Amino acid sequence: MIMELFHTILAIVALILSSAVVSSAEISLASPRKLKLQSLANKGDVRPLQVLKLQEHPGRFITVVQILLNMVAILGGGIGESALSPYIADILNRSFEGSWIAPTASTIAFILVTCLFILFADLIPKRIAITYPEMVALSVVGIMNFSMYVFKPLVWFFDTIANVFFRLFRISTVREDGMTSEDIFAVVEAGAEAGVLKTQEHYLIENIFDMQARTVTSTMTTRENIVYLDRTFSRQEVMDTLSRDSHSKIVICDNGLDKILGYIESHTLLTMYLQNENVVLTDPKLLRKALFVPDTLSLYEVLELFKSTGEDFAIIVNEYALVVGIVTLNDVMSIVMGELVSNEEEYIVSRDENSWLIDGATPLEEVTRVLDIAYFPDEENYETISGFMMYMLRKIPKKTDSVVYGKYKFEVIDTENFKIDQILVSLVKEQE
């Protein structure tokens, strides 16, 4: 009798272990990260490739899992209830009498076996598979491939019926594994929150992706701020301009910015003046040809142009061939570096925890990051916070004009001609 009980317990343990393997396979083979598996496969392990192959045809894998789970459950219930109930009844008969003992023993045996299967054949293995999907998947993929071979006729039968059902109702069974920019942002965000990525690395990655979305006008020096020399300037006018506004390169024009002849390296010009040389601003040996780019290019495209041409300075023109600004390699790279570098003049200055002073030329991306605003209305129509104010007010803003958007109030506090210089942003209570 003891040997029979031992054999029964051994059979139940074997069934629980079998069910645990299948349950863990059900979770682990469906959840491993494709990139992680490919990385493991590149190290020479063939098991990740087997997992990837199973993921390409999930129907057959799911079918064999369900066949095995149901077989084990039926066997476990039958063996457990019929084999254990006599022993439980014998224990009850030692203390009690009555016709209720047999059905009670069967119920106790059923509950006991069910609890064992739920705990050790389902919950624990699935929790382990969720926590270590790649490790568990690599451990069980061989067993599952063997099971699919053994039950191939049944797998084919059930999988065919399921496919007919899907085709009948036009349900796609193709798994979409395409990586989008949103997926990458989510992974980066999760890495930053988990501490895998440092704060600086987080900013760098986000800013690199911003380069494709942002146009060159978001970081250019605008037309009214361009420092230039006219070809007719005297030596004193040139020296006064250079002493007032020091830049490594300076634009040479012919009667205004809309006729740019090229640019000159400031240090070369100053060196020639210090050596008392006769300087002609239009001298071909001194004047360099400027790179002109349309204002529709993204920062990434401008960076590629700088790379291909060897230039680090470009003139930006609009569709009417009017100069709207200039951009340098340093301007583009400052977008990548973001908050890792300190600008001489910050676009956004925090007055206190509930208010900020913002330069009118601040790109929307900077405002959304600092104020944690998800998006601005119709933001494809403008690129700066000044453009947002004009769009919302539907007029040229003047002092004290304000806009309430979300939980913030945007108020114009300084203008110059038609340009917004500064905006005061304050936190307001949301209207109920």
UniProtKB/Swiss-Prot annotation:
This is Polyamine export protein. The chain crosses the membrane at residues 2-22, 61-81, 100-120, 138-158. Keywords: CBS domain, Cell inner membrane, Cell membrane, Membrane, Repeat, Transmembrane, Transmembrane helix, Transport. Involved in cadaverine and putrescine tolerance in stationary phase. May facilitate the efflux of both cadaverine and putrescine from the cytoplasm, reducing potentially toxic levels under certain stress conditions. Residues 220-279, 286-345 form the CBS domain. It comes from the Bacteria. It is a multi-pass membrane protein. Residues 1-201 form the CNNM transmembrane domain. Its main location: membrane. GO terms for molecular function: flavin adenine dinucleotide binding. It comes from Haemophilus influenzae (strain ATCC 51907 / DSM 11121 / KW20 / Rd). It is found in: Cell inner membrane. InterPro entries: CBS_dom, CBS_dom_sf, CNNM, FAD-bd_PCMH-like_sf, FAD-bd_PCMH_sub2, Ion_transp-like_CBS, Transptr-assoc_dom.
